[in-house]
A protein has these predicted regions:
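Structural transition elements
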Residues: 327-360, 375-381
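Surface-exposed binding/hinge segments that line
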Residues: 110, 144-188, 211-213
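Ligand-site clamp/hinge motif
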Residues: 195, 225-271, 396, 405
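Gly/Pro-rich hinge or "lid" segments in bacterial periplasmic/extracellular proteins
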Residues: 85-89, 178-233, 237, 245-247, ...
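N-terminal lobe/hinge region of extracytoplasmic solute-binding protein
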Residues: 53-102, 133, 202
Length: 538
C-alpha cells in the first residue's frame, strides 16, 4: 500500500461524516446524497413499492445545481466513481481501483466497461472526463466545482483509465470524486447538467426516474441492468415523498403510507412503538452551523462573537431538545474526527465571562441583532435556544426565518455566490449575505469540504467573511498533509484558530436517526443520509 493509500485508509475512512439535512424542512426527511436509496416495503403494490420521506427541495435536482432535498433524487438515478459506506470507507463503484502518485498530486482511476446509462448507451472514460470538466467550466456555475479543489485537471489515459492532476497534494482526493460530492454523478458526454437534465435524469444509477414533481413526489423504477448485480434493488418501484415537517411524516409512517423516515429527532423516534418500528443511529459531524460576519455589522469584534458562543449551554440543549442524540461540538468541524486534538479546552456556558467580553468590546449593555435562516423544525428550535441564551447578556435577538419551500425564495436564493473575500456584501437575508445566520450541513467522511469552502477566507461558501491568515494556513496544512501525524497537527491548529476567531458556532454534531417499519428489513443509511443497504420485505 502506498503512502497516499495508507493515509487515506488511516485518516479518511475512519472519519465521521456537508451540508443540507438533519431532518430538513422535511424534518423527518431523508437527505440521501449517495447512490443507493433502496429498501423494502410490504406496503402498496403487494410489497413491490418502497416509500420514504424526504426534505423539501431548495433547488432543482440537476448535477450542476443540486442543493438540499434534491440530493436524494440524484442519489437514486446516479452513480459515482467511488461510493462512501456507512463506516466512511471508500468502496469501488464505476471505478474499480484508484491510486495516488507523485506525492498525492496525481490520482489515477480504472473505470468499469460494463456501465450503461438509462438510455442504454455505454459509459466511457470520455463521459467521466466530460462530467468533471463540465463542473470545472466556470460558465456552468456548478455548485460542485469547488469540492474538487482548485487547479484540478482531468484527462483520459485510455479507454479504461482517467487521471486527475492536482496543483497541491491531497491524500483525501478520492472523496472529492465520490458519492459525497453528490453533484458529480456521471453524465453522458455533451449533456448539460442544468435544469434541462431533469426531464430525463439519464444517469447510471440503480433507479430510473419515472415522474418528478418538485417538492411533492418523485417515482422511480428499478434498473434491472444496473452494473453491480448484487446491488440491484429488490423492489420494483421507489417513491420519494417530500414533507414539510416530521409532524406530517410520522402519521404517514404509522398508517403505513411510508416505510421509512430518516433524520428524525431522537425523542420523536422514541415515541414510536418498538413492536412496529425499528430505529438505527449513525453518528456524524453534521448539524447546524451558525455564522457571524467578521467584516461588517455588529459582530466584527471577535470578543463579541466569543461572548455569544459562551451563552450557550450545549449539554443542556443536546439532552433537553435533542433527546441526547448528538455529541457536544467545540465550534470547529474537526471535533468528531479521530485526528482531533482532545487537549483543546471545550467551550462551555460562562455568562460572567461573556458579559466581560462585551464590556471589553464597548457594548456592555448589549444590542439588537437579527438571526436569519429558513424555517424547519430543527432550526426553529435552535433559534429559540440562541435567542433566550443571548438575552442573558443583553443581546436582543430577533429571529427572521424564510418560510418558503427549502428556503429557496430567499435564504438559499444564491443571488450572492460565490463568497468573495473582501467584498463586504450587504445583508440580504441570504446564507452568504447575512450578518448572523444558520445553515444546515450534512456530515462528511472527511472535513475537507467544510474547511476549503466554509472556513477558509477564499471559500466559495464562506458566510462569515473572516480574513485570518493563520486559520487559512492551518486549513492548507490539513489539506496537504500526507500522514496521520501531520493531519493531527493541522487539526490542532484549526481547532485553536476556530476558537480564537469564532467565525462559526457549532454546538453539536448530530446523530442521524432513522425509523423504519418492521415490515422492511436491511435498511441502513450512511453518514450523509444515503441508504446503503438493499433492503427487502421482512
Amino acid at each position: 500500500m502506498s503512502t497516499i493509500e495508507q493515509t487515506t485508509t488511516e485518516v479518511s475512512t475512519s472519519g465521521l461524516s456537508r451540508r443540507h439535512f438533519i431532518q430538513a424542512a422535511a424534518a423527518t426527511g431523508i437527505a440521501i446524497p449517495f447512490a443507493q436509496m433502496i429498501g423494502g416495503s410490504s406496503i402498496g403494490a403487494a410489497g413491490k413499492v418502497f416509500r420514504y420521506a424526504s426534505q423539501a427541495q431548495e433547488g432543482p435536482a440537476a448535477p450542476w445545481m443540486t442543493k438540499g432535498g434534491s440530493l436524494g433524487i440524484l442519489n437514486a438515478v446516479g452513480s459515482w466513481l467511488i461510493d462512501v459506506a456507512p463506516s466512511g470507507e471508500l468502496k469501488p463503484s464505476v471505478a474499480t481501483a484508484w491510486k495516488g502518485t507523485n506525492g498525492g498530486t496525481t490520482w489515477t482511476f480504472t473505470i468499469r466497461t460494463d456501465v450503461k446509462f438509462h438510455d442504454g448507451s455505454a459509459l466511457t472514460a470520455d463521459d467521466v472526463v466530460y462530467t468533471v470538466n463540465s463542473h470545472l467550466d466556470p460558465k456552468n456555475k456548478s455548485q460542485s466545482a469547488a469540492k474538487l479543489g482548485g487547479g484540478v485537471t482531468c484527462v483520459k489515459v485510455d479507454a479504461k483509465t482517467v487521471r486527475f492532476d492536482l496543483q497541491k497534494p491531497n491524500a483525501n482526493f478520492p472523496y472529492n470524486v465520490s458519492s459525497s460530492n453528490y453533484g458529480l454523478l456521471l453524465m453522458k458526454n455533451g449533456v448539460k447538467g442544468d435544469e434541462s437534465w431533469i426531464a430525463t435524469m439519464n444517469g447510471t444509477g440503480k433507479w430510473i426516474m419515472v415522474s418528478h414533481k418538485l417538492n411533492e413526489k418523485t417515482v422511480f423504477k428499478r434498473n434491472a441492468n444496473y452494473f453491480d448485480e448484487a446491488q440491484i434493488p429488490s423492489f420494483e418501484t421507489m417513491e420519494q415523498i417530500q414533507y414539510v415537517s416530521q409532524s406530517a411524516a410520522i402519521p404517514a409512517l404509522k398508517t403505513g403510507k411510508l416505510d421509512s423516515i430518516h433524520l428524525l429527532y431522537g425523542n420523536e423516534a422514541d415515541t414510536l412503538p418498538k413492536t412496529k418500528f425499528y430505529k438505527t443511529l449513525v453518528p456524524t459531524c453534521g448539524g447546524l452551523h451558525m455564522h457571524m460576519r467578521a467584516d461588517i455589522g455588529q459582530l466584527t469584534d471577535k470578543r463579541v462573537r466569543e461572548a455569544i458562543a459562551l451563552t450557550l449551554d450545549r449539554t443542556a440543549y443536546i439532552k433537553g431538545v435533542l433527546g441526547g442524540y448528538a455529541l457536544v461540538a467545540n465550534d470547529s468541524v474537526m471535533d468528531s474526527f479521530p485526528t482531533a486534538d482532545k487537549s483543546v479546552p471545550q467551550r462551555k456556558k460562562d455568562i460572567a465571562r461573556a458579559k466581560a467580553l462585551l464590556a471589553e468590546a464597548g457594548v456592555k449593555n448589549g444590542f439588537k441583532l437579527t438571526l436569519q435562516s429558513w424555517k424547519r423544525d430543527d432550526i426553529d428550535k435552535f433559534t429559540a435556544f440562541v435567542k433566550s441564551s443571548c438575552k442573558e447578556i443583553g443581546i436582543d435577538v430577533t429571529v427572521d426565518l424564510d418560510g418558503s419551500d427549502g428556503g429557496g425564495a430567499r435564504w438559499y436564493a444564491y443571488s450572492v455566490y460565490p463568497s468573495v473575500k473582501g467584498s463586504k456584501v450587504a445583508n440580504k437575508g441570504e446564507w452568504l449575505a447575512s450578518e448572523f445566520g444558520i445553515a444546515e450541513w450534512a456530515g462528511r467522511p472527511v472535513p475537507d469540504e467544510y474547511l476549503n469552502r466554509e472556513w477558509k477566507s477564499t471559500g466559495d461558501w464562506n458566510p462569515h467573511y473572516l480574513d485570518a491568515p493563520d486559520l487559512d494556513a492551518a486549513v492548507d496544512a490539513w489539506l496537504t498533509a500526507l500522514t496521520p501525524a501531520k493531519k493531527k497537527a493541522a487539526s490542532s491548529l484549526i481547532q485553536k484558530a476556530s476558537l480564537k476567531y469564532t467565525p462559526i458556532i457549532v454546538v453539536y454534531n448530530e446523530t442521524r436517526v432513522t425509523v423504519t417499519s418492521n415490515k422492511v428489513k436491511g435498511v441502513e443509511f450512511n453518514q450523509q443520509g444515503a441508504n446503503w443497504t438493499s433492503g427487502t420485505n421482512a
